[in-house]
């Protein structure tokens, strides 16, 4: 039981970039935020920046790295003179199969039972990279993925933390003959992700955009440009 006043506290984790403008100050707690886009669009850089800002505030991050994209050197660049603090605050899981991904989430839940007060962020980068059809059919995958997302949301709510997932994209052809981008996982991941941000590559070198595709109380369709720089994102 809790007071409504406490549930309304605006305690977000900032990216310290222009992306915060469309998110209302940063990534929300007690929900799942999904960043999706093509390779190189900035998904992992955003999660690294969130982990650094979490450490700057004296809290831990659990980082489930399914693609091998978590670079110690990149974290060192973004962290600057607080690298040692950041390195001590990030707990990393590196699953090599979709089954191990589920086990990593279970172990994260067990970790939070004793470290929930000191942990503010759980990252799953990315949510579906490890799935292969040979591991099972689509219906069993959806069932397993739904269970994983349910567990992740339970962690966010029970321990008052932010849960962030990244996702890949694929192109679909609409009835009008035009190509559209859609995140992998379709309606299932959309159901669990109450905040969704699409990352786009611009036409000019280094140009990127973030578009708010789903949010409970922010203007959907809001779009900002951002850049990946040596010490993070702007």
Curated annotation (Swiss-Prot):
Disulfide-bonded cysteines: none
Source organism superkingdom: Archaea
GO molecular function, one term: damaged DNA binding
Biological process terms in GO annotation: DNA recombination; DNA repair
Residue ranges crossing the lipid bilayer per the database entry: none
A UniProt-annotated Pfam family: Rad51
Family designation: Belongs to the eukaryotic RecA-like protein family. RadB subfamily.
Protein function: Involved in DNA repair and in homologous recombination. May regulate the cleavage reactions of the branch-structured DNA. Has a very weak ATPase activity that is not stimulated by DNA. Binds DNA but does not promote DNA strands exchange.
Full protein name: DNA repair and recombination protein RadB
């Amino acid at each position: 039981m809790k007071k409504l006043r406490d549930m309304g506290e605006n305690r977000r984790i900032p990216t310290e970039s222009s992306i915060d403008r469309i998110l209302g100050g940063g990534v929300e707690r007690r929900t799942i935020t999904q960043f999706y886009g093509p390779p190189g669009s900035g998904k992992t850089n955003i999660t690294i920046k969130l982990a650094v800002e979490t450490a700057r505030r004296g809290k831990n991050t659990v980082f489930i790295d399914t693609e091998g994209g978590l670079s110690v050197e990149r974290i060192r660049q973004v962290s600057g003179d607080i690298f040692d603090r950041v390195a001590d605050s990030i707990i990393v899981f590196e699953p090599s199969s979709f089954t191990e991904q589920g086990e990593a989430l279970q172990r994260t839940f067990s970790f939070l039972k004793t470290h929930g007060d000191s942990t503010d962020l759980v990252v799953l980068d990315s949510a579906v990279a490890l799935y292969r059809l040979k591991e099972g059919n689509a219906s069993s995958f959806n069932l397993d993925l739904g269970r994983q997302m349910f567990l992740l949301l339970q962690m966010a709510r029970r321990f008052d933390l932010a849960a962030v997932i990244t996702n890949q994209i694929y192109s679909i052809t609409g009835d009008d003959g035009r190509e559209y981008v859609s995140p992998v996982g379709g309606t299932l991941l959309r159901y669990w992700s109450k905040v969704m941000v699409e990352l786009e590559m611009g036409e000019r070198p280094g140009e990127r955009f973030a578009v708010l595709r789903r949010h409970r109380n922010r203007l959907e369709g809001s779009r900002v440009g951002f850049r990946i720089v040596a010490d993070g994102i702007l």
